[in-house]
């Protein structure tokens, strides 16, 4: 691409998920419904954990942070995506694009580490129940959660600082529904080898470390479950672990497929569809899998609703 086609940009144009007019209403209603459920479930979960004393445990401490992160990064992306479905002007300012990417990246990396911490928490609870409250003390919980947010912030700052150094772009049209880094980098005129290499290395390192923690934790949990004498206890534990691993597999699978591979130079429709799963669907599924299927949460919700009705 010749240098004469390169220029600075003041704004980007987000193409969105589809340019087929007949799909606009269906897409809008579908994602509005998913976003509504996501907000209600995650904010409701946070509130329930705060008001219910029986949920003041390490597991629900981390679950409240997961709900907060899911709420945040879904809200960073979905409202703008919904607005762009019907808007002819799909522009987002350069600054707005960078801010959206930074906040999104911070939340996603935080969730990557938070899911690993939650897997470790389940390992301690099931495999070492007598030491659970000591091992996962308030101080330890705060330190682990803080580390997750710190890793998310640092990784995002690295990518943001490198992205801000790109002087010229050959186009301002992003083939995506939000400002993700790979499609933005594909528009750069300058050499982005460092950007792409760091994106690959950081994502691969984060994924490798956290997946290893998750797999090790659940393997040890599985070993403990198989030793249980109660068939009902085994079934309940298997069901819980299977649902957790399903959500984790979908989340990490899409992250791996998009960020932990050599750059293809563009963001195709397959990438956009895959991205929908961990930016829109997973925040909703997490609230269902980690909370609505949980007996303690159901009991706490029933107690809170009962007290409201009788008051």
Swiss-Prot record:
One GO CC term on file: plasma membrane
Disulfide bonds: 97-189
Gene Ontology terms describing biological process: G protein-coupled receptor signaling pathway; sensory perception of smell
Coiled-coil region(s): none
Superkingdom of the source species: Eukaryota
Extracellular side: 1-25, 76-99, 161-196, 259-271
Entry's Gene Ontology molecular function annotations: G protein-coupled receptor activity; odorant binding; olfactory receptor activity
Membrane topology: Multi-pass membrane protein
Compartments, record wording: Cell membrane
Location, primary (coarse class): membrane
PROSITE patterns cross-referenced by the UniProt entry: G_PROTEIN_RECEP_F1_1 (PS00237), G_PROTEIN_RECEP_F1_2 (PS50262)
Transmembrane regions listed in the UniProt entry: 26-46, 55-75, 100-120, 140-160, 197-217, 238-258, 272-292
InterPro entries: GPCR_Rhodpsn, GPCR_Rhodpsn_7TM, Olfact_rcpt
Side of membrane Cytoplasmic, spans: 47-54, 121-139, 218-237, 293-311
Residues carrying covalently attached carbohydrate according to the record: 5, 195
Keywords: Cell membrane, Disulfide bond, G-protein coupled receptor, Glycoprotein, Membrane, Olfaction, Receptor, Sensory transduction, Transducer, Transmembrane, Transmembrane helix
Function: Odorant receptor.
Family listed: Belongs to the G-protein coupled receptor 1 family.
PANTHER family reported for this sequence: OLFACTORY RECEPTOR (PTHR48018)
Protein name according to UniProt: Olfactory receptor 5L1
Organism: Homo sapiens (Human)
């Amino acid at each position: 691409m010749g240098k004469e086609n390169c220029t600075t940009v003041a704004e980007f144009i987000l193409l969105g998920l589809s340019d087929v007019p007949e799909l606009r209403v269906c897409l809008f209603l579908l994602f509005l419904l998913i976003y509504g459920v996501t907000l209600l479930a995650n904010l409701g979960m946070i509130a329930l954990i705060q008001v219910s004393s029986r949920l003041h445990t390490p597991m629900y401490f981390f679950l409240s942070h997961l709900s907060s992160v899911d709420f945040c990064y879904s809200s960073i992306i979905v409202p703008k995506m919904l607005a762009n479905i019907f808007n002819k002007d799909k522009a987002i300012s350069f600054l707005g694009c960078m801010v959206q990417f930074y906040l999104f990246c911070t939340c996603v990396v935080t969730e990557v580490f938070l899911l690993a911490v939650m897997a470790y928490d389940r390992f301690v609870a099931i495999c070492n129940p007598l030491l659970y409250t000591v091992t996962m003390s308030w101080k330890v919980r705060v330190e682990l959660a803080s580390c997750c947010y710190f890793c998310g912030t640092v990784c995002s700052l690295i990518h943001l600082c490198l992205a801000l150094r790109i002087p010229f772009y050959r186009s301002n049209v992003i083939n995506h529904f939000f400002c993700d880094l790979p499609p933005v980098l594909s528009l750069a005129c300058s050499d982005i080898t460092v950007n792409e290499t760091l994106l690959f290395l950081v994502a691969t390192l984060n994924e490798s470390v956290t997946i290893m923690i998750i797999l090790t934790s659940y393997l040890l949990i599985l070993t403990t479950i198989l030793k249980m004498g109660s068939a009902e206890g085994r079934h309940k534990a298997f069901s819980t672990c299977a649902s957790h691993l399903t959500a984790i597999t979908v989340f990490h699978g899409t992250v791996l497929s998009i960020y932990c591979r050599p750059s293809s130079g563009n963001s195709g429709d397959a990438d956009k569809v895959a991205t929908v799963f961990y930016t829109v669907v997973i925040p909703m599924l997490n609230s269902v899998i980690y909370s609505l299927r949980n007996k303690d949460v159901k009991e706490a919700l029933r107690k809170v609703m009962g007290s409201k009705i009788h008051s």
